[in-house]
């Protein structure tokens, strides 16, 4: 690996870690917007919030009647909301997004109070005191967070509906991989931002709109954003299930083998094939992922907005999805950036799908 590529990977890694440290539980994506802006706003010509909370960053190409190219990666992360404050400093919660309750016990969390952040741990029953077989996964409303405060102290600091998230963490592991929380989908958001920011303006074939969309893990709010933006064409960027022992090969992708490009009945086949051809020509490693119907990402919502927005779905391989120890390959993140950059500089795609002007 040449030094220049390694330097770029290190820059990208820092952005991934910085973004993943921001609290953005579904419904609270704007909680640390000022920190987000301090990280990335200077790399774009403008930024704004739409009516539902999607955060858009714009880089203009400087050409008249240029196509609008949308890059979507969701900003929200899985987490919890407080549902009950109990005696003894305990809190009951409900989940926001899919959480594996089997990994929650004894994990450390942060409760984002009115004026301060409180630390807690999800209470765990010692094995020798547990009843039953121990094989049943606890339900989310059966778990309690221990804060060590009194009920009265808690009620002065938090309320029902207060968000609770996993404590920020990041670890470098072997073979150029890193582990941490909310890489789904902050790692992809970082790749979209980095690719748009570092691609020379004169190489862009259209104005690039990076949309950090909200609430993908729950209902999804990208559709109103895509409708309002009305891009000429779009790329949805999300994580894909990383292959580990016991998983099906046809349902997963390998880490360190490049990003995935999805073949689906509901995304644009021609745009997908053109991206695959571009990846081949530029010798960008990629994997094919097959999702016959719904992709499980924002791609479908974008594709179905307005009269239909041509959309391609790409993925970053990720292991231990929806846990606080998600694993990604740094080599995959840089390769994903290469693929995104190729997408926003591809003249053939722009000629085929670019509508010009406002995309009308």
Language-model features: locations:
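N-terminal hydrophobic/helix-forming segments and targeting peptides
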Residues: 1-360
């Amino acid at each position: 690996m040449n030094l220049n590529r390694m330097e770029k990977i290190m820059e990208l890694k820092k952005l991934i870690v910085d973004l993943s440290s921001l609290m953005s539980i579904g419904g609270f994506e704007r909680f640390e917007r000022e920190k987000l802006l301090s990280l990335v706003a200077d790399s774009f010509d403008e930024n704004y919030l739409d009516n539902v909370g999607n955060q858009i960053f714009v880089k203009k190409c400087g050409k008249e009647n240029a196509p609008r190219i949308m890059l979507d990666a969701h900003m929200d992360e899985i987490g919890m909301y407080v549902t009950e404050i109990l005696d003894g400093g305990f809190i009951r919660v409900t989940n926001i997004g899919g959480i594996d309750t089997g990994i929650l016990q004894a994990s450390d969390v942060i409760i984002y109070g009115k004026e301060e952040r409180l630390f807690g741990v999800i209470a765990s029953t010692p094995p020798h005191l547990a009843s039953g077989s121990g094989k049943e996964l606890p339900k989310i409303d059966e778990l309690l967070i221990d804060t060590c405060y009194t009920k009265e102290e808690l009620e002065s600091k938090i309320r029902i509906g207060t968000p609770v998230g996993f404590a920020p963490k990041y670890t470098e592991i072997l073979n150029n991989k890193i582990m941490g929380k909310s890489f789904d989908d902050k790692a992809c958001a970082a790749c979209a931002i980095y690719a748009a920011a570092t691609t020379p303006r004169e190489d862009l074939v259209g104005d690039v709109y990076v949309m950090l969309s909200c609430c993908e893990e729950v209902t999804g709010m990208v559709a109103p954003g895509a409708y309002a933006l009305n891009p000429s064409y779009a790329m949805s960027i999300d994580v894909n299930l990383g292959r580990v022992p016991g998983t099906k090969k046809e349902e997963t992708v390998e880490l360190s083998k490049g990003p995935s490009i999805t073949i689906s009945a509901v995304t644009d086949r021609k745009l997908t094939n053109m991206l695959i051809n571009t990846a081949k020509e530029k010798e960008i490693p990629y994997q094919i992922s097959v999702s016959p119907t719904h992709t499980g990402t924002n791609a479908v919502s974008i594709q179905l907005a307005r009269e239909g927005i041509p959309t391609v779905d790409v993925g970053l391989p990720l292991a231990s999805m929806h846990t606080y120890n998600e694993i990604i390959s740094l080599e995959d993140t840089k390769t994903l950036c290469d693929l995104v950059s190729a997408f926003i500089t591809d003249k053939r795609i722009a000629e085929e799908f670019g509508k010009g002007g406002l995309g009308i």
